[in-house]
Amino acid sequence: MHGECDVWYFDSAGFCLTPSIPYAWQPIGSVIEVPTSAHNRRINVLGFLTRHNALVPYVIEGHIDTDIVIECFEQFSQHINRRAYVFLDNASIQKSRKFIRHIPQWVKRGLIIKYLPPYSPELNLIEILWRFMKYYWLPFSAYMSLQCLLQAIEDILQRFGTDYTIAFEMK
């Protein structure tokens, strides 16, 4: 990374067996069937992302809460090697008293929390990663089972920055 500090964007995204398919092409008169599950189990990905495609993801099967978000920040803050600004949205689990109580401890480690303006997801660059994963990179086969979905998500996250990249404009 360049400069005196690092800038990261944090957010979480949920993935389930109902595919996010914006459109599909098929011959006239044919039908494409996408199997879905009646079970609504989720895979949640929490992550820290830079404009340079550095990604620190945390994959959680099931529900996320303040304690899980705190643990992600705790782990992340212990591995930074210089001042890091983390921009995040105003989700209640990230604005809870419990979360806020940990901020001074993270600041001592060089991790500075900055909240984005309310209702401004376009300012959180990691939202672009979630969109690419859901609408472009996850194959149809990922939705066959929760295990297939987990495997596909982990594959994308592992290969992000090399095989999967996002070209953020620097203005």
Label each region the model flagged.
Residues M1-K171:
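Short functional hotspots at interaction and active-site rims
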